[in-house]
């Protein structure tokens, strides 16, 4: 793909848009970056791309800019159905995303990881498994390092491990990973998709360009993933819910075994794994299959499982105060993630939820909240919705903010109980992102008097 002299519009000026602009300019293209936001809200990125040599258009989109482009590259947060993009398509202008663009310049095999929950942990763990096996890996994508950064850079890895969101999959065309992994499909982003069918169809796109020489790693217990199997051409391996004739992982006490049909090939121990919860055993199994399919050794996979310490804001232990433990699960931005968090605790939980609703069905938490929660503290825009859904299951405290929620929870929690931030919502009503929310929670907890 030759970009030299082409007029390219990069839509969205955040991390991805800035990286796309740099990449395309490096390839000799003429680049315009378009964003509906103001220069004040975008901060230093505006001057950054201008200094690179790009034009910048802010505010309402200019139709002519889009319809006269040679190529449009959109960031994940930009809906691919907005009117200016539809008009450009009608004029024959290709509209793709950053992942599709980068993949056309990447020679190394790609391991693509998608799914509602667990994908960042799995992506990171695969990278560790590859490196522990002596195979150099670039780990990026939706995890915070756009793939175009790898495509632009001089240092090349033997394999690319990429976290891919549903929004990114909506704009792929020829993207064809050697290994595609789908962790699970549960309700999320219902504010953007027209029901679960549309969301699941987006996730299924990760497999669409694979061939029989490739590998699809699937969750056999997930009904949406199972429904995709008939349309997948790649070899299918299951990290959970494997049926007798299928290839994949079978869990037993403290270990996981890899089978193809009735034949056992290898076994991995989970005894030294520091990640807690059944969901993290599934994450380890999924990562192990993907890494093995890409050439990692069993020894390297085992070493990475033993050494991996987990990621921030994912049921991360923060501190113990007066025999009460505090956990930061800010990354839990949907209902299923909250369920997974609650499943991992035997002690009564003081649960902090809230933020910006993504269209989740909070009533699905009713039974688990009744079993596990001592109190529920609600914050942010979704406080009313969560209260309506769960007020009959647990005492609900209107906290408003995370700081107040921690204050109320500290007063109420008894020795041996736990306080868990697991919001079940996006963070954008009060914070820039889930990381900022998690850091704020940790700040408040660490400031508590002992």
UniProtKB/Swiss-Prot annotation:
The lineage of its organism: Bacteria, Pseudomonadati, Thermodesulfobacteriota, Desulfobacteria, Desulfobacterales. PANTHER family: UDP-N-ACETYLMURAMOYLALANINE--D-GLUTAMATE LIGASE. One of its GO terms (molecular function) is UDP-N-acetylmuramoylalanine-D-glutamate ligase activity. This is UDP-N-acetylmuramoylalanine--D-glutamate ligase. Cell wall formation. Catalyzes the addition of glutamate to the nucleotide precursor UDP-N-acetylmuramoyl-L-alanine (UMA). The gene is murD. It holds the Pfam family Mur_ligase_M. Belongs to the MurCDEF family. GO terms for biological process: cell division; cell wall organization; peptidoglycan biosynthetic process; regulation of cell shape. ATP binds at residues 115-121. GO terms for cellular component: cytoplasm. It comes from Desulfatibacillum aliphaticivorans.
